[in-house]
C-alpha cells in the first residue's frame, strides 16, 4: 500500500523494539546515515497488534528527535494473523481487468469479510499447468491493523507513505542486496522476538510465504 512517493525513512515496529533507519542511495548501493533502536515493554505489541499506542508513539518520537531526522515520510511493514497471503489460479486477464473484479475474485480466498480488509493483487505469470490460466497472489490485511499502525506513525509526527508485508519487505531486501544472485530456490527467514517470517523464492518469485507466531523470546524463555 503506497500513500505517496518521496524520500522514506525505514520504520520497524516490532514486539520488543522499534527501529528507525535513514538510508541514502549512493553509487553502488546504499549508505547508512542514521540508525536508532528503542526498547518497548512486551505488552505494547501482542501478536503484532498495537495494545499500548501511547508508548509506541513516544518511542518513535524519541528516536526521531535523538537522531535529529528532518525527513518525515516512512516505509514500514506488517504481519501476523490479520494479514493473509494467498496464491490462486485464475483465467488469463490483464492487471487492469483483474483490478475490476478484484473483490469478487478474492472473496473466495480471503477468510475475512472482504469489506473489512485492504486488498491488493499481483499477477505472477502464466500457470505452469494450463496455458489459459495464470497464477495470482492476493494480499489482504484487516483495515484495523493498517489503520492502527498508520495512526501511531502520524501521531509520532511522521507520515506513513508505504505499508508493506514483512515477508515481501524481506524479499525486497534480498533483491537489493543480492541483485546478481543465481536464480534458484532460496529461503528467506527473519526471526523476530515473537514472530518468524518465511518467504521461499524460486527463480526470483515467491512460492511460499508464511508468518509463524513464535520467535526469539519464546526460545529464550525455554
Model regions and ranges:
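Non-catalytic, solvent-exposed interaction/assembly segments
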Residues: 1-105, 147-149, 157-159, 184
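Short flexible coil/turn linkers enriched for glycine and charged/polar residues
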Residues: 2-5, 14-17, 70, 80-82, ...
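Structured core elements
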Residues: 10-12, 19, 75-77, 137, ...
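Short, ordered loop/turn segments at secondary-structure junctions
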Residues: 25, 165-168, 212
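Oxyanion-binding/catalytic loops of NTP- or PPi-dependent enzymes
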Residues: 35-45, 128, 175-222
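Conserved active-site and cofactor/substrate-binding residues in soluble primary-metabolism enzymes
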Residues: 51, 55, 144, 214, ...
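Active-site neighborhood for divalent-cation/phosphate handling
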Residues: 77-177
Amino acid at each position: 500500500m503506497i500513500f505517496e512517493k518521496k524520500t522514506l525513512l525505514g520504520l520497524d515496529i516490532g514486539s520488543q523494539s522499534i527501529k528507525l533507519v535513514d538510508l541514502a542511495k549512493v553509487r553502488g548501493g546504499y549508505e547508512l546515515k542514521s540508525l536508532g533502536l528503542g526498547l518497548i515493554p512486551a505488552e505494547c505489541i501482542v501478536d503484532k497488534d498495537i495494545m499500548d499506542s501511547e508508548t509506541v508513539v513516544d518511542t518513535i518520537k524519541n528516536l526521531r528527535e535523538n537522531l535529529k531526522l528532518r525527513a518525515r515520510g516512512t516505509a514500514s511493514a506488517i504481519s501476523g494473523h490479520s494479514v493473509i497471503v494467498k496464491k490462486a489460479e485464475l483465467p488469463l486477464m490483464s492487471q487492469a481487468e483483474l483490478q475490476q473484479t478484484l473483490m469478487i475474485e478474492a472473496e473466495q480466498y480471503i477468510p475475512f469479510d472482504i469489506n473489512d480488509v485492504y486488498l491488493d493483487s499481483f499477477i505472477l505469470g502464466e500457470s505452469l499447468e494450463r496455458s489459459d490460466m495464470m497464477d495470482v497472489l492476493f494480499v489482504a490485511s484487516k483495515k484495523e491493523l493498517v489503520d492502527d499502525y498508520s495512526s501511531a506513525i502520524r501521531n509520532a509526527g511522521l507520515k506513513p507513505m508505504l505499508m508493506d508485508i514483512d515477508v515481501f519487505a524481506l524479499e525486497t531486501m534480498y533483491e537489493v542486496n543480492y541483485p546478481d544472485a543465481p536464480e534458484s530456490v532460496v529461503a528467506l527467514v527473519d526471526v523476530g522476538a515473537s514472530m518468524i517470517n518465511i518467504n521461499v523464492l524460486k527463480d526470483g518469485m515467491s512460492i511460499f510465504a508464511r508468518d509463524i507466531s513464535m520467535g526469539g523470546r519464546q526460545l529464550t524463555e525455554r
